[in-house]
């Protein structure tokens, strides 16, 4: 993972950690369920954004490198598996 992408990923993970801790506190405080759910949706969106950043970085680096090295089939199999798992 490139340094800039890694820094962005780590920053977003810290944000997600903090957000989840906040959700935990809300549940412990018996906060209204709808308010807790809104925060869990925000966490999900943050994770989806994180996944997008990681995937874009992977496509720009590892996938390009794999194709240049002639590992087309392995790269495509890996991307197909990732798609299957992410569905």
What spans do the regions from the language model cover?
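Solvent-exposed interaction patches of small proteins and small membrane subunits
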Residues: 1-87
